[in-house]
């Protein structure tokens, strides 16, 4: 809090006083505005340069570098801008789950879990949401965004309790990137990758 998303110098000074799982002096820092707060993402310089070299060796143009979840979250905020309540973002991919609970555009809870047991995961998610709402002064109606593939969606959509006033805000994205298959092979984007690419596309307009 109290930082501007464009003030990298102030952010580095503030982060220097924190216990961090990375070496600040050897990392690139990216800042994003989140509902009046600032999200900081760091990545080692050597790792970034290694990926730049990979792109260069493939003779592909590199226009920008971004973090998948950070970009996807920006897309999420764009698409749910009209929602006034609290926001639940549920990500399920290859047996792994992630629950991110937002209030006022700020992610307050970020919890990863195994999603192999759907019923058990439903119970865990409800417990986490209940505990979170118990800490809030005035819990708001819940809106859900489900970043889940179509084949898994039927197992998870029931977690949204419409009878309790909850709403499923998930929608089909209006833009998709063109597939590139130089070697005759293409793979569909996961929902969170699609959301991130959608955000980057919108920001380029």
Task: Describe every region a protein language model picked out.
Residues 1-205:
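Hydrophobic/aromatic-enriched cytosolic interaction surfaces used to assemble or bind macromolecules
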């Amino acid at each position: 809090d109290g930082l501007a998303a464009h003030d990298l110098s102030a952010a580095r000074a503030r982060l220097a006083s924190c216990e961090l799982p990375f070496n600040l002096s050897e990392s690139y820092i990216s800042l994003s505005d989140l509902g009046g707060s600032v999200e900081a993402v760091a990545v080692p310089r050597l790792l970034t340069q290694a990926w730049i070299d990979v792109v260069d060796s493939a003779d592909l143009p590199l226009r920008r570098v971004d973090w998948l979840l950070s970009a996807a979250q920006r897309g999420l905020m764009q698409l749910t801008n009209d929602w006034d309540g609290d926001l639940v973002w549920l990500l399920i991919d290859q047996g792994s789950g992630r629950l991110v609970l937002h209030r006022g555009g700020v992610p307050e809870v970020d919890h990863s879990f195994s999603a192999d047991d759907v019923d058990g995961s439903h119970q865990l998610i409800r417990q986490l949401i209940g505990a979170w709402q118990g800490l809030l002064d005035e819990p708001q109606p819940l809106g859900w965004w489900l970043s889940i593939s179509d084949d898994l969606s039927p197992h998870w959509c029931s977690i949204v309790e419409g009878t309790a006033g909850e709403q499923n805000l998930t929608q089909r994205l209006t833009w998709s990137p063109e597939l590139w298959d130089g070697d005759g092979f293409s793979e569909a984007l996961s929902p969170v990758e699609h959301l991130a690419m959608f955000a980057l596309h919108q920001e380029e307009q």
